[in-house]
Regions:
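HDAC/HDAC-like amidohydrolase catalytic core signature
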Residues: 1-154, 159-176
Length: 177
């Protein structure tokens, strides 16, 4: 059975007129359930990601600024979201969802995170609506625990996952396509 990471926290209220389509995180599971593509048994709610798992990928200074909501106005503009405790919690849950999906995929072949794919986050900064790079964090999680020998990240976004590519450029066991 395919497992899909989803949490109500994936939807985060944004200012009126904000261009990010946050509503999709509610609509996707609703539609999949409505059409019978999945059942509630397919969905699981991740917990928050552990700090140490994040720090294998992100700089401690950036992480501390992020979780303490001390990003500068310029850093917030690059990310595209206003700082809030709920947004940080959302990112921690999304990231753990991707780790959980990677573990489930190793055992069962496939898993999905409805809100994963935050590929524009770099070690020392976020950008493009990405605060933490969940894919790089999950890859480092698997490698650190010797759960994978090689990892392929398939990124089909028109903008390319620049953060993931940069974070993994010196890691020969990870290839970003």
């Amino acid at each position: 059975m395919i497992k899909i990471a989803f949490s109500p926290i994936y939807y985060h209220e944004l200012p009126v007129g904000h261009r990010f389509p946050m509503l999709k995180y509610e609509l996707i599971p609703e539609q999949l359930l409505h059409e019978g593509t999945i059942s509630l048994d397919n969905l699981f709610v991740p917990k928050k990601c552990d700090k140490m798992d994040i720090l294998r990928t992100h700089d401690v200074a950036y992480y501390e600024k992020l979780v303490n909501r001390q990003l500068s106005p310029s850093e917030q503009r690059k990310i595209g979201f206003p700082q809030s405790p709920e947004l940080i919690e959302r990112e921690l849950v999304i990231t753990q969802g991707t780790i959980d999906c990677a573990l489930f995929a190793l055992e069962h072949g496939c898993a999905l995170n409805i809100a994963g794919g935050t590929h524009h986050a770099f070690a020392e900064r976020g950008e493009g609506f990405c605060l933490l790079n969940d894919m790089a964090i999950a890859a480092n999680y698997l490698l650190h625990r010797n759960l994978a020998k090689k990892i392929l990240v398939i990124d089909l976004d028109v903008h390319q996952g620049n953060g993931t590519a940069k974070l993994m450029e010196k890691e020969s066991r990870v290839f970003t396509f």
